From Swiss-Prot:
Belongs to the bacterial ribosomal protein bL36 family. One of its GO terms (cellular component) is ribonucleoprotein complex. It comes from Idiomarina loihiensis (strain ATCC BAA-735 / DSM 15497 / L2-TR). The keyword Heme does not apply. Signal peptide: none annotated. This is Large ribosomal subunit protein bL36.
Length: 37
């Protein structure tokens, strides 16, 4: 899980979702997991 100021899609499997007011990226590749903070 990377914590970044700006979350971006890295590959075509990445999805940007908002969960409890937190922007996250979920992906089939675990390296692409990100959270805005």
């Amino acid at each position: 899980m990377k914590v970044r100021a700006s979350v971006k899609k890295i590959c075509r499997n990445c999805k940007i979702i908002k969960r409890n007011g937190v922007v996250r990226v979920i992906c089939t590749d675990a390296k692409h997991k990100q959270r805005q903070g």
